[in-house]
Amino acid sequence: MEVNILAFVATALFILIPTAFLLILYIQTAAQNNG
């Protein structure tokens, strides 16, 4: 079974980008709360 690399990359980006964005927002919020 051949793996569709483009589909794999697209899925990885679709998962990682929102996760990274939320993680950055969380870190910024935590840093502000630690003040």
UniProtKB/Swiss-Prot annotation:
One of the components of the core complex of photosystem II (PSII). PSII is a light-driven water:plastoquinone oxidoreductase that uses light energy to abstract electrons from H(2)O, generating O(2) and a proton gradient subsequently used for ATP formation. It consists of a core antenna complex that captures photons, and an electron transfer chain that converts photonic excitation into a charge separation. This subunit is found at the monomer-monomer interface. PSII is composed of 1 copy each of membrane proteins PsbA, PsbB, PsbC, PsbD, PsbE, PsbF, PsbH, PsbI, PsbJ, PsbK, PsbL, PsbM, PsbT, PsbX, PsbY, PsbZ, Psb30/Ycf12, at least 3 peripheral proteins of the oxygen-evolving complex and a large number of cofactors. It forms dimeric complexes. It is found in: Plastid, Chloroplast thylakoid membrane. GO terms for cellular component: chloroplast thylakoid membrane; photosystem II. Keywords: Chloroplast, Membrane, Photosynthesis, Photosystem II, Plastid, Reaction center, Thylakoid, Transmembrane, Transmembrane helix. The chain crosses the membrane at residues 5-25. InterPro entries: PSII_PsbM (IPR007826), PSII_PsbM_sf (IPR037269). This is Photosystem II reaction center protein M. Its main location: plastid. Pfam families: PsbM. It is a single-pass membrane protein. It comes from Adiantum capillus-veneris. The gene is psbM. GO terms for biological process: photosynthesis, light reaction. The keyword Cytoplasm does not apply. Belongs to the PsbM family.
